[in-house]
């Protein structure tokens, strides 16, 4: 999953809190769900979408290896073992060297048995600059991309020559211009294709303004363990009501986060319950018995505007011992460090609260 985070910022959203839920409370539901939805591209699917065979062929023929591809397999294995042994202990921290190089998602030793090349055909035969000064090249790098890192992108742009422009797109994972909810990287590509001669004059300041990935703080198992929302002016609800507000907002935010992974229009809550989605670019969600915590249900509707980021919701949260709240909430999903506002009634008392947008 750490590897997959390089192409899926949803892993960054959930992983820390999900790991702590297992380690601190023996609660594996969040981590198991994250693993289930974080299926790497070449784990399954049609070859027309992604060819694992073509990938390994390119990897073994074009990529530099930790051993000599012209050597016999036995010699390669010895060279590879020596290369691994020479790595510093913290090369893949917080993972050990052995944990990382033996991970099934990595291919460090994947070419040990690959046939030796029958002729020399390096993918790049020249020396920098690699393109003529009249040929513009746009290089985009995601700030959270650990597969092709932004430092690699910067090096590529330098090797291309002075006609290249490198742009780091903050808070973005692998392949910046596809599935681009903010329209920044995709807009840069479109403007480049339309007017390549204006590459160095294009305003790319949007790349530094992409909002942060809002990480989940906790995955509480029960309502009593949830951090309460912060009371606002006019609030008369007690701690339980404020916890109901926090859980209600978390359930809506969790359903929105799941939208990116749904193969259709139906999804499931973290600990039971269901929700449905329809519409685009205005997404309408309906939650039925969704349990973000095990002992409280969330029912209601939400609207999420993909273009503006505006989220509004009306939900009823029912907890243990008859505790209940009827709530309205709003936040902007595209804001930087956005806050959610929650109003309504809990236990017969007015509730007004704020909390970090889920």
List where the protein language model places each region.
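Alpha/beta-hydrolase fold active-site neighborhood
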Residues: 1-127, 131, 212-215, 219-337
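Active-site-adjacent alpha-helix of alpha/beta-hydrolase-fold enzymes
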Residues: 150-165, 172
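Histidine-bearing beta->alpha loop at or near hydrolase active sites
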Residues: 170-177
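Conserved alpha/beta-hydrolase "acid-adjacent" motif
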Residues: 11, 146-152
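Post-His helix in hydrolase/transferase enzymes
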Residues: 177-194
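Acidic/polar loop patches that form or flank catalytic/metal-binding clefts of enzymes
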Residues: 165-168, 197-207
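Edge beta-strand at a domain terminus
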Residues: 345-358
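Short beta-strand/loop motif that positions the catalytic acidic residue
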Residues: 132-133, 138-141, 145
């Amino acid at each position: 999953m750490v590897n997959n985070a390089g192409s899926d910022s949803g892993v960054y959203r959930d992983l820390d809190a999900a790991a702590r839920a297992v380690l601190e409370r023996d609660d594996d539901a969040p981590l198991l769900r994250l693993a289930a939805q974080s299926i790497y591209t070449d784990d399954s699917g049609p070859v027309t979408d992604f060819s694992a065979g073509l990938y390994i062929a390119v990897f073994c023929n074009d990529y530099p290896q930790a051993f000599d591809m012209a050597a016999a397999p036995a010699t390669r294995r010895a060279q590879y073992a020596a290369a691994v042994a020479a790595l510093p202990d913290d090369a893949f921290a917080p993972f050990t060297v052995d944990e990382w190089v033996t991970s099934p998602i990595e291919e460090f030793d994947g070419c040990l048995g690959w046939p030796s090349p029958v002729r020399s055909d390096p993918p790049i035969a020249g020396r920098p600059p690699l393109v003529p000064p009249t040929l513009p090249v746009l290089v985009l790098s995601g700030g959270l991309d650990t597969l092709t890192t932004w430092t690699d992108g910067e090096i590529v742009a330098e090797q291309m020559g002075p006609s290249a422009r490198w742009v780091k797109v903050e808070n973005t994972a692998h392949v910046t211009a596809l599935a681009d909810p903010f329209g920044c990287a995709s807009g840069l590509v479109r403007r480049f294709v339309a007017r390549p001669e204006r590459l160095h004059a294009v305003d790319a300041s949007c790349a530094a303004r992409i909002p942060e990935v809002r990480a989940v703080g906790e995955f509480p198992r029960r309502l009593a363990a949830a951090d309460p929302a912060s009371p606002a002016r006019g609030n008369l609800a007690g701690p339980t009501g404020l916890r109901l507000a926090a859980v209600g907002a978390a359930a809506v935010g969790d359903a929105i986060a799941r939208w990116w992974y749904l193969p259709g229009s139906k999804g499931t809550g973290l600990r039971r319950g269901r929700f449905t989605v329809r519409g685009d670019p205005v997404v309408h969600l309906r939650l039925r018995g969704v349990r973000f915590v095990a002992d409280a249900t969330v029912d209601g509707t939400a609207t999420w505007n993909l273009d503006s980021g505006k989220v509004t919701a009306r939900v009823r949260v029912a907890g243990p011992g008859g505790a209940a709240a009827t709530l309205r909430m709003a936040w902007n999903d595209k804001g930087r460090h956005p806050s959610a506002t929650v109003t309504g009634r809990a236990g017969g008392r007015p509730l007004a609260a704020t909390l970090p947008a889920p």
